[in-house]
């Protein structure tokens, strides 16, 4: 059996790690012993935060909606209840966007929700 020297393979693997570690601080970008665990940890954070991002944005939309419905004499929970009772099925992301970019449209929706609560 012929001998296999691992120079080419090792170089390719290291190059892959260095590419992922680009922009890291200090030895973590140019020493394989420091770069490898740093890249692994970065990937763990990325995986975790892709899940967390969804929660964070939903919380942001809820905060924005709560702030937007207060001038109409509603709280967020009463607003959502009113939407359900009036049969409006628009998600929080779109509602939040409406509240910021189209206040008149959002006001109409808020008034409908308020009317559904009163009825």
UniProtKB/Swiss-Prot annotation:
Belongs to the bacterial ribosomal protein bL20 family. The keyword Phosphoprotein does not apply. This is Large ribosomal subunit protein bL20. One of its GO terms (molecular function) is rRNA binding. Gene3D superfamilies: 6.10.160.10, Ribosomal protein L20. NCBIfam families: rplT_bact. The lineage of its organism: Bacteria, Pseudomonadati, Pseudomonadota, Alphaproteobacteria, Hyphomicrobiales. PANTHER family: 39S RIBOSOMAL PROTEIN L20 (PTHR10986). Binds directly to 23S ribosomal RNA and is necessary for the in vitro assembly process of the 50S ribosomal subunit. It is not involved in the protein synthesizing functions of that subunit. One of its GO terms (biological process) is translation. Pfam families: Ribosomal_L20. It comes from the Bacteria. One of its GO terms (cellular component) is ribosome. Keywords: Ribonucleoprotein, Ribosomal protein, RNA-binding, rRNA-binding. InterPro entries: Ribosomal_bL20, RIBOSOMAL_L20_CS, Ribosomal_protein_bL20_C.
């Amino acid at each position: 059996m012929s001998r296999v020297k691992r120079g080419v393979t090792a170089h390719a693997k290291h190059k892959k790690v260095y590419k992922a570690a680009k922009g890291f601080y200090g030895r973590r970008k140019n020493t394989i012993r420091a770069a490898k665990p740093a890249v692994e940890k970065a990937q763990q954070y990325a995986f975790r935060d892709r899940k967390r991002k969804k929660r964070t944005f939903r919380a942001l939309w809820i905060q924005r909606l709560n702030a937007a419905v207060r001038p109409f004499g509603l709280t967020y929970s009463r607003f959502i209840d009113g939407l359900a009772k009036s049969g409006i099925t628009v998600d929080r992301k779109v509602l939040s966007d409406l509240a910021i970019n189209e206040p008149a449209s959002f006001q109409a929706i808020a008034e409908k929700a308020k009317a559904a609560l009163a009825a």
